[in-house]
């Protein structure tokens, strides 16, 4: 069973994450309504499926590919972020390490590893 997230903590955390990225010119992308086979995050063996409109689709694990798509399509934007629900059909979930359904906040930006490291340092300080 997936552990419930306390709403006040959830709201506070999302407000902090959103305000950080919006203040840097990032745009939020809704990725969950995009039917796609680009669903796997790490291990394609953990992808669950669902039937929708007569077709079988993978339940999304990540919005990463859609964030990268938006970044390539809109190079003038500094970056993009999303909040999505990740579904992982872990065969042997480890308590305290694996949740099979959980919210995930992701971002993609222009730049190399150094720019990413600076962004992450700033994000940690903001939180």
Task: For every predicted segment, state its role.
Residues 113-118:
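Short, conserved charged micro-motifs
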Residues 1-110:
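Class II aminoacyl-tRNA synthetase-like tRNA-binding/catalytic domains
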